[in-house]
Structures are given as C-alpha cells and as structure tokens.
Amino acid sequence: MNFETSRCATLQYCPDPYIQRFVETPAHFSWKESYYRSTMSQSTQTNEFLSPEVFQHIWDFLEQPICSVQPIDLNFVDEPSEDGATNKIEISMDCIRMQDSDLSDPMWPQYTNLGLLNSMDQQIQNGSSSTSPYNTDHAQNSVTAPSPYAQPSSTFDALSPSPAIPSNTDYPGPHSFDVSFQQSSTAKSATWTYSTELKKLYCQIAKTCPIQIKVMTPPPQGAVIRAMPVYKKAEHVTEVVKRCPNHELSREFNEGQIAPPSHLIRVEGNSHAQYVEDPITGRQSVLVPYEPPQVGTEFTTVLYNFMCNSSCVGGMNRRPILIIVTLETRDGQVLGRRCFEARICACPGRDRKADEDSIRKQQVSDSTKNGDGTKRPFRQNTHGIQMTSIKKRRSPDDELLYLPVRGRETYEMLLKIKESLELMQYLPQHTIETYRQQQQQQHQHLLQKQTSIQSPSSYGNSSPPLNKMNSMNKLPSVSQLINPQQRNALTPTTIPDGMGANIPMMGTHMPMAGDMNGLSPTQALPPPLSMPSTSHCTPPPPYPTDCSIVSFLARLGCSSCLDYFTTQGLTTIYQIEHYSMDDLASLKIPEQFRHAIWKGILDHRQLHEFSSPSHLLRTPSSASTVSVGSSETRGERVIDAVRFTLRQTISFPPRDEWNDFNFDMDARRNKQQRIKEEGE
C-alpha cells in the first residue's frame, strides 16, 4: 500500500483488542473462513500459514482447480487536526475460492471441505503450537476423509477391500500392464505349461511357475502386484477359492512356511510377499511390491506356487478357476488387470494336449454344422479328420461357440456385449418390462418438451432472419465443448427456424446399443441429425442420458442409497427433480450423501431449463449458474479462504510540539519523581 509522507514520526504497534474483535466478527464470514483466521491469529508462526506452501497443498489436492481471488481493502482514518496526531487502520483481505474443475468424479462427495480442513488442522498442529477452537466442536460431526498429504506407513496399510465379485475383464490401464509366460514345453514331464490358444495355465501342485509382468511406463512409487483366485462359472463365483482340508491340515508343504495353510497361491523367493484375506468377502490373495525390470530385460518375473489340485474333494472339486493378476497403487486403486484360467493337475502336458484337441474338434464340428443346414450322415470325412461318431447336438442355450477376433479392442468390445447378454438372462421379466416402459415414458416426455420449445411463440417473429443467423455464429465456450452436462444443455433455441425442422430429436434420448431391446418392431430409430454448418466450428450434438435413479446415483457415487428411493417407488430422475433438502431428509438418506444428491438434482434442473442463447454460451461454468441453495451444496470440493493483513499506523507530532498537545514527557517525569519522594 502507498502511504503519504508526513513530517510526523510513524510508530507501528499491535492493534487494541476492540480492533481484533472487529476483525473477527463471525457474522461477516463463514465458519471455514473463521477457521483460517483463528488459526493464523493464534499461531506463533504466522509466516508458515501465510506461506505459499499451504495454498500449494490445497492446490495440489484439487488437481486442476478453478481459483478466483476477490480483494477487499478497508481504510479507517480518524479526522486529524492540523499538524496533529493521526490514527489510521488499514485492512486488506483476499477472499480466495478454489474449486475442482472435474465435478463428475464419483468419489468427490467423500472429500468434503470439513474433511480437508481437519487434515490441514492436523498438519498445522504438527508444525506449530497453535490450536483451533473448531477441533472439539466438529470432532464428532466431521466427515472422515483421507489426508491429501499423509502417506501410509507401510506399502499395504491403505488397501481397500475387494468387491464381492472381482472383475475378470482384461484392463491394460494407463501403463499398458500385461502378463505373459515363457515358451513352455508340451512334454508330459513338464511341471507347467501355458496354452495361448486356450489362455489357460497347466501346472503341478507346489511347483514353481514363473509369470512375467510387463509395463510400458513405470507405475507410481509403492505399486503392488496382487494375485487372486476366483471360480470361473457364475454358479460358483461367489465362493472363496481355498485349499482342500486334506492339503490344508497336512504337514507336507506347510511346515516352515509363512503363508497361511488355507491360501491356494504362494509366492516363492520374495520375502516381501504379504498374504491378505479380505475381512468382508473373505477372499484370499497374495501381494508383492512391484520391482522394475533389471538391466537388459523388459519383464519382471514373479514365481508363484499353487498348493492344491483342481480335482481335490472339499476344495476346488474339479471346478475351473481363474487367476486375476492386478497392478495396484498402495491405496488399492487398480492400474491394470489380466486374467487367465488355471488347472492344477498331475500331468500338465497331457491335459493341455487333450483340451486343445477337444476344442479343435468342437470348432470343426461347429463349422460343419453351420455350413450346411441339412442333416449329414453320422460317418463323414471333414478336412482329413475321421469322425467315427457325432454326439447328440446340445440345445442352443448350452452350446458353446467360439468366434476368432482380430484385435484386442474389438475383442474387449465383443466381450462386454457377451457379458451384458449373459447378465440380461438373470434379470426377471418384470424388471425388463419396467425398464422398457421407463424408456418410452422418458422418450415421450422429452418429445413434449421439444414440441413446446419449437412452437412459434418461443422464437418470436419480430426479429429478422439476419439476426437469427447471427445467433448461429456465436460459438460455445471451451468449457461447454468439454463438459458433457453443458453439452446436453444446448437446445434448438440457438438454431434458426429454417433449420429447426431438420433436427426434431435434438435434446432427446438417443438409444444406444444397450437400449435396442426397448424398441418395438414398429418403432424406428431417430433420423440422423442434419445441421448445415454456417461457421467453421459447430457445437457437438448432446450426449444420450439415462435418467433412471440407478444411473443418476451411480454418476454421483451414491449407489449405496438406491434402496432409499426404490422402497418409495421412485425409479426415474423426473420423480425427484422437484425434491428439496427436506424431502431428501425425509427419505432418511445419510447426510454425507444428501448434499451430493441435492447438487445432482440442481444440475438436472439446470439441464432442462432452456434459457436464452446468450446465457447458455456466455456462462463460464455450471457453478456460477446454480445460485439457489448454494449454502446447501457445501459437499462439493470447494474451499473458501480469507487471507488478510491488518496494519495500524499512529502518527505523533514532533517532540518540540508535544507541549501544544499537553504531551510533555519531561513534566510527567518530574511529576512522577515528586510522587516517589513524597512516598518515601
């Protein structure tokens, strides 16, 4: 700040208590701002709290925040007399708001402002002797959130429990995680062998089986590799794979081992291996820290042992199993996943050859049957293979067919379709019918809104066509091109009348591959969008949205609250789009999820409130348009802080002018000396 030069001497000192009370008036600030101010005012190391490191920690926690600073300057000056003393108080405040730009993260409701402030309070207490008055007030009501700075004391401290049914879908992840095997022998004497055709491992019990781990980019520090067995078939997948009682209780392979006797998979030659049993699901797995490949190699080798036969009664009992190998961070986040089938047997080479021959015969038989629809004799020659007999053809539901696919991306897409069709068989028929009815109601509801928007009164006939064409040239902002929610908010109100007829389905639900079952044979897909471009950049079409309660809660990361809605007969978002916070509280929804659901309802309302094009195209973010109930949406990752500077300047006249202001120091000293002598 700039100060006027004065011939008066300047003295700076700490302000009086009434000034401190004025600054800390709680009515002017939120409790989070008061928290920052009380912490900084009580600390003996104020510079540490005002240093850029504290705000950098918050900045890093929000990854890529939207930061806005609003400076506030206040000046209080007593009216000075001519050449007299003055008392000047200057307060400079910076109101800082940092908000995460990615509000679609399903985990963001768990990282509340209160949880972050509690973690910062712990860091501040560790670095200074100051304490906050909010520690005791909010200790019991605070939402527990992990500290963004704290690191686990051990590699395996923060591992999250595995789901009830682990995923068996291959996922290379951001590091191109892959699992492979060395060139194996098919001889009967081989202790292990791997079939790339069947994607299946054959090995003997308690024999070393090397597995090669490969990544294209190094994973984060402290990454681990987990190996977990699961049953392959759907009727057994919920059971935990363990050793049979015979091998578990025998002394063979158990004496002198650190691994629990019930674990099927063991790691050999790694003293850092840790055997984990999930306390909720009971699934057993073994973890080893990830080690980068040695010089001259591109693989990291892990030696695994399988401690029970697939045919053991009381254990696997001839049920096929899958081995899921995942690359995870120290807090349990999956960075990559690979899966393969395993069979533990006495003669791996023999069993592999038998399985491969059987599958080849099955493929030849299927291709022959599909090539000619007429019945063929039981004895025939096909490609040089003598078919002495053909078994009775299975029913279409039990028949296994194999489709060779070129390219992993195509394979994973077909695999998702296959899994979706299989899961469809487990749904009851009334659930399917309800879903189709919801889709039809949603389709009709959006069509009605579309019709009301395209009415002539909505556009008005006073504006000339040239003005309408100019509105088409207005381009959306970058945030609207990136944010899918605002992309859905683009409506036909920004399109001229001449072009509105060509896009009757704008803003409606476009059926995807998963919605084909909801269309009757008489219904047709919406016509393709035809939008003649009048500029070099055309806004993208809106994304299709699923307005069911299940999808709505899944997008918010609140899937656990589904029962609170379904028990009341609420199945679509349109049934709760007018709900308030009191309505959500009446449903007995937990408070930590209530704010997130309320924020999602507000966003849904915003998407269906068709405003003028200028509002849609000039809005910098969705957060600025949601003003209703802003005090109730504190669950988002938004941090408000106030950084202030208080300076009080008192100016005194020169010493030779003190007599004019009855401020003679020599006279006061003489008076005090006389009082002292009289007292003696």
Curated annotation (Swiss-Prot):
Phenotypic consequence of R97C: No effect on transcriptional activation in a luciferase reporter assay
Gene3D superfamilies the UniProt entry points to: 2.60.40.720, p53-like tetramerisation domain, Transcription Factor, Ets-1
Protein name: Tumor protein 63
Effect of substituting Q204L: In cervical cancer
Function description: Acts as a sequence specific DNA binding transcriptional activator or repressor. The isoforms contain a varying set of transactivation and auto-regulating transactivation inhibiting domains thus showing an isoform specific activity. Isoform 2 activates RIPK4 transcription. May be required in conjunction with TP73/p73 for initiation of p53/TP53 dependent apoptosis in response to genotoxic insults and the presence of activated oncogenes. Involved in Notch signaling by probably inducing JAG1 and JAG2. Plays a role in the regulation of epithelial morphogenesis.
Gene behind the chain: TP63
Organism annotation: Homo sapiens
Superkingdom assignment: Eukaryota
Tissue specificity annotation: Widely expressed, notably in heart, kidney, placenta, prostate, skeletal muscle, testis and thymus, although the precise isoform varies according to tissue type. Progenitor cell layers of skin, breast, eye and prostate express high levels of DeltaN-type isoforms. Isoform 10 is predominantly expressed in skin squamous cell carcinomas, but not in normal skin tissues.
Domain SAM residue range list: 541-607
Region Interaction with HIPK2, residue ranges: 352-388
UniProt cross-link Glycyl lysine isopeptide (Lys-Gly) (interchain with G-Cter in SUMO), position: K676
